Regions:
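Glycine-rich hexapeptide-repeat left-handed beta-helix
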Residues: 2-19, 53, 59-61, 67-68, ...
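N-terminal segments that cap or nucleate solenoid repeat domains
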Residues: 2-44
Length: 191
């Protein structure tokens, strides 16, 4: 009989549930474990860890998860990352929801229950505390994180849209050079 966690989930977890679109681009040195879903053209770079033990992690189409990123859910708190997003080096996302077309800065931390609106930028090193919610189209900075100001359409294009497009092109080149790989239709990362 399975032991029960303090939050009521079983310790018998199926860690072979990763689902990746065949167009995803994956580094052989990343870690994908548990209930993780990668959309079309998602790139997961070296040293990143996505671990879905008790709730799902969903990374929607055309996201770039850069080197050293940690993404983990919590009991009843899935991680959902909207399409066309850049998650910067060494960022940590835990039990949060990120809107589409955002830039998540290097070494920032986004905690359980936090929500980031679409077309937003979370500055490098920011700490988004538990349960904090931010609207669409804002610059989020500091420890603890606060809205600095609204972003202009030009800033959204320069900081969110264009970098995401550039990373898609870079990961396509890495795929062609064998640095990244596409998963097979019967992909089982832990096999």
């Amino acid at each position: 009989m399975a032991e029960e966690h303090a939050h009521g989930s079983s310790t018998e977890i199926d860690y072979h549930r990763v689902k990746a679109d065949p167009t995803a681009r994956i580094s052989p040195s990343c870690s994908l474990v548990g209930d993780v879903t990668l959309g079309k053209k998602v790139a997961v770079m070296a040293g990143s860890c996505l671990r879905g033990d008790d709730a799902p992690i969903v990374v929607e189409d055309e996201c770039n998860i850069q080197e050293g990123v940690v993404i983990h859910e919590d009991y009843g708190k899935p991680v959902v990352i909207g399409r066309h997003k850049t998650v910067g080096h060494r960022a940590m996302l835990h039990g949060c929801v990120i809107g589409e077309n955002c830039l998540i800065g290097m070494s920032c931390t986004i905690m359980n229950g936090a929500k980031i609106g679409k077309n937003s930028v979370v500055a490098a090193g920011a700490l988004v505390t538990e349960g904090k919610e931010f609207p669409d189209g804002v610059l989020i900075v500091g420890v603890p994180a606060k809205v600095r100001r609204e972003l202009t359409e030009e800033e959204i294009a320069d900081m969110c849209t264009f970098p995401g497009d550039d990373y898609l092109k870079q990961t396509e080149a890495m795929l062609k050079d064998g640095v990244l790989f596409n998963p097979a239709p019967d992909f089982d990362f832990q096999a």
